[in-house]
């Protein structure tokens, strides 16, 4: 069974990493997986996965965190010729693969600026000698659109072109229809895969609290408050490990039992040994903490008008899976009390964190059901 994936990351690598876990699970499950990656160095994220080949499209990225524009690697806005080159490469790859399943990441729930490209891909897929199952892959939360015309157009695309939506979340924690009500109104089945989490690495260090921060102003504030708390409250049995983004230059040491690190791939091995994880409420940050056994304290990113992270933090807190600290309330006393509250949270043993494997099973089942016997 052949699977073709379209994925486009714009700001950070979260979307591509989640799709790499899904592609890897599908490949390990015996599918022949081809990926068309449109973000900078996107194809590299898929290298080395079993039965997965990745093709790099001419890359595009966002100009800022508000997704106000697109830029090429040279920092220029893409012109018609650039878009045509991307489209031609994408469609040539699709026709070479002749997939049984076409999996499109996020669209039509997002990536609106890529509508012409994705719709051309869909029409080309429909014109193949054997029409593939066309499915959407979407995370647990969709940023709502204020313009009802845009919402109606998204609903129209979903109804007209897609046979299924794979939702990488848990309906009991937060249904997709909470942030995209139209998804429940157009007759396209929603299949909840569970959360797409990484395999757990071995813990190399016993860490009481692990703090990770993003690159924006909110990340800098979180690092500074965490250092202020840790220098007075870290204990030998409960050290604090604070991982900072490259642009910050915190003190090399802030007291005994406090360890400050540049962000690195070793982060997850520390997280695997942590009792509590303090970080923003992005999809991967939240799910990795739960999968690795740490109790999450979620301090969501709220810059650039984003609602995704506060929505996720509130939902996980309501479900008893995380402690929620709004960014506006972030100070040393509140962070300390929230960390202490998180210690009493139950482990995530009953939460479905095998979303990549379940996505593969769902896709194979849907394809089998769609082929006339």
Can you name each region flagged by the protein language model?
Residues 3, 27-81:
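Conserved nucleotide-sugar phosphate-binding/catalytic loop shared by glycosyltransferases and other
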Residues 91-159:
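Conserved nucleotide-sugar donor-interacting segment of glycosyltransferase catalytic cores
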Residues 267-311:
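A donor-sugar binding/catalytic signature common to diverse glycosyltransferases
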């Amino acid at each position: 069974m052949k699977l073709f994936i379209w994925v486009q990351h714009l700001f950070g690598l979260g979307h591509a990493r989640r799709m790499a876990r899904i592609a890897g699970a599908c490949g390990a499950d015996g599918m022949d997986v081809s990926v068309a990656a449109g973000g900078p160095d996107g194809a590299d994220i898929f290298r080395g996965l079993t039965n997965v080949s990745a093709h790099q499209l001419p890359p595009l990225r966002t100009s800022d965190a508000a997704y106000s524009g697109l830029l090429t690697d040279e920092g220029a806005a893409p012109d018609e010729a650039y878009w045509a080159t991307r489209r031609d490469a994408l469609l040539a790859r699709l026709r070479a693969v002749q997939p049984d399943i076409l999996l499109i990441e996020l669209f039509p729930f997002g990536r609106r600026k890529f509508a012409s490209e994705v719709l051309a891909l869909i029409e080309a897929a429909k014109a193949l000698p054997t029409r593939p199952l066309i499915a959407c892959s979407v995370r647990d939360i969709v940023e709502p659109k204020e313009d009802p015309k845009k919402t109606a157009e998204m609903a129209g695309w979903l109804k007209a072109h897609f046979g299924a939506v794979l939702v990488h979340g848990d309906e009991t924690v937060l249904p997709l229809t909470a942030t995209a009500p139209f998804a429940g109104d157009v007759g396209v089945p929603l299949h909840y895969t569970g959360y797409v989490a990484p395999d757990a690495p071995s813990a190399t260090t016993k860490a009481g609290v692990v703090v990770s921060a993003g690159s924006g102003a909110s990340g800098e504030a979180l690092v500074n408050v965490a250092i202020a708390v840790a220098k007075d409250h870290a204990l030998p049995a409960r050290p604090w490990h604070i991982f900072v983004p490259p642009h910050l230059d915190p003190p090399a040491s802030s007291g005994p039992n406090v360890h400050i690190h540049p962000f690195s791939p070793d982060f997850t091995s520390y997280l695997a040994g942590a009792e509590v994880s303090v970080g923003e409420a992005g999809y991967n940050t939240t799910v990795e903490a739960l999968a690795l056994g740490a109790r999450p304290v979620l301090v969501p990113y709220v810059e650039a008008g984003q609602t995704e992270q506060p929505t996720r933090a509130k939902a996980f807190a309501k479900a008893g899976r995380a402690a929620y600290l709004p960014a506006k309330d972030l100070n040393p006393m509140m962070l300390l009390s929230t960390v202490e509250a998180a210690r009493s949270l139950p482990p995530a043993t009953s939460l479905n964190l095998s979303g990549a494997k379940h996505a593969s099973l769902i896709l194979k089942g849907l394809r089998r059901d769609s082929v006339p016997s």
